[in-house]
């Protein structure tokens, strides 16, 4: 059991350091990082700082970074879906809630007909008890509460991975393996220091204590034994 726990711990550390490389360079490039997750599976804790939500998930197996437009699983939006939205004083959408277990103060029910949350930043549909179709503007800093309760920021096209320069995309993709390479070098150096030097088969005197027979005989640390009883 201890071996399994040790494996999961080490594997998670490796994956987290790998993903941090992607996270750091994506942030530097202006790519929207929606989520930095530790673990996999169902979410058990989340905290949002700025435009990134940091989550702790149930299964202690690695982690991942969700970059906008880079192989991420977005919230599915279908015509006819009933959600709740939060509007500001100018009727601009500031929050879209797809989790029916979460109740938000000052939110209003809305039935979706169409949504473009990348280019036009619009939401089309009907308010409850109304047959008038309306098209609302969506703020570029609006948030989406996904069906599992994770709250992420919308991803305008200019903040997506493919909108970054080629060089920034290369750096972001390569940063994960680069971090693992640096980690392996650091671990190698640390292990080397912990071993206390390079193993050798030479008969060389190590530490000599003051009350030992070797000390009385005049042996010193570093002396090389040439023969015994010779």
What are these regions (language model features)?
Residues 1-7, 171-173, 177-197, 201, ...:
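Protein maturation boundaries and topogenic segments
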Residues 2-3, 159, 230:
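C-terminal recognition in membrane/secretory proteostasis and scaffolding
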Residues 3-89, 102-152:
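Small-residue-rich helix-interface/hinge motifs
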Residues 27-34, 196-213:
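Alpha-helical transmembrane signal-anchor/signal-peptide segments
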Residues 52, 157, 201-204, 221:
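Envelope-exposed proteins and targeting segments
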Residues 94-95:
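An N-terminal, globular interaction/scaffold subdomain
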Residues 142-185, 189:
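Interdomain regulatory linker/hinge segments that flank or connect interaction modules
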Residues 206, 214-230:
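Conserved PDZ fold ligand-binding element
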């Amino acid at each position: 059991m201890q071996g399994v726990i040790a494996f999961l711990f080490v594997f998670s550390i490796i994956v987290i350091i790998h993903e941090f490389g992607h996270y750091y360079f994506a942030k530097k490039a202006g790519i929207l990082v929606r989520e930095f997750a530790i673990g996999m599976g169902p979410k058990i804790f989340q905290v949002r700082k700025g435009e990134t939500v940091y989550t702790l998930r149930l299964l202690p197996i690695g982690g991942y970074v969700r970059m906008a437009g880079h192989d991420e699983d977005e919230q599915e939006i279908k015509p006819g879906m009933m959600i709740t939205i939060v509007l500001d004083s100018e009727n601009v959408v500031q929050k879209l809630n797809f989790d029916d277990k979460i109740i938000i103060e000052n939110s209003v029910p809305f039935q979706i007909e169409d949504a473009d949350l990348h280019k036009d930043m619009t939401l089309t549909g009907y308010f409850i008890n109304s047959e008038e179709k309306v098209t609302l503007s969506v703020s570029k800093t609006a948030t989406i509460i996904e069906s599992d309760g994770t709250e992420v920021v919308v991803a305008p096209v200019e903040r997506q991975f493919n909108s970054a320069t080629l060089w920034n995309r290369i750096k972001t993709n390569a940063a994960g393996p680069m971090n693992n390479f640096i980690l392996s070098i650091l671990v190698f150096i640390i292990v080397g220091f912990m071993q206390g030097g390079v193993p050798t088969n030479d008969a060389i005197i190590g530490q000599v204590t003051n009350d030992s027979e070797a000390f009385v005989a005049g042996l010193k640390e570093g002396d090389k034994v040439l023969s015994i009883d010779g």
